[in-house]
Amino acid sequence: MNLTDYLLDTFNYNDQTNKKLLDKINLIDDKNECIKLFSHLINSQYKWMARIIQDPKAKEMSWWEPVYNFVELNCEWTKSLQPWITYITASTDEELSSEVTFIGFDDGLWAATPKDIALQLNYHSIHHRAQMQTIIRQQGIEPDFIDYIGTKYRKLS
C-alpha cells in the first residue's frame, strides 16, 4: 500500500468510527463534553489544513472554538474532512513527505510533513474518541466496538 492509500484508509476509518460515535452521543443525556471534544477534532482538521496551505488566518484559528451544536457535528465533520481527502489525493508521496512550515503557538516557525500532520489528526482523534467512549459508558450506554481491526479482520471458521 502506498502512502496516499494508507493515509486515505486511515482517514476513512476515522470518519466511519467518528460517525458511529455521534450515533452513541445522541443517546446520552449530557452531551456537552462530547460536543466540545468532537468540535475540537473538527477545528483541528481545519487549523492544520490552514497551516499546510499557509493560510494567514491559521494563527488566529482556535483549536477549541467554535463549539458546534450537536445537530451540526456530522455535517461539519464531513466539511472539515473533505479538504484532507482532496489534498492527499492530489499529492504525491514525495509531497506528503516533504516538510511544510507554519507559525506555531509561540509565534515561532515550525516544520512538519503533511504525512505526519495527517497521522497526528487521526491518532489525536483516537485519543479523544476514547474520552468520549468513557463519557458514554459513564452515562449508562455501552459504546460500540470501534477498534480498527474490527474493520479489517474476517472469520474463517
Residue ranges, per PLM feature:
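Short Lys/Arg-rich basic patches
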Residues: 2, 6
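Active-site rim elements
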Residues: 7-8, 71
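Short, contiguous alpha-helical
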Residues: 8-65, 106-157
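Short acidic/polar alpha-helix capping motifs at helix-coil junctions
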Residues: 48-50, 95-100
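Helix-adjacent hinge/juxtasegments
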Residues: 58-98
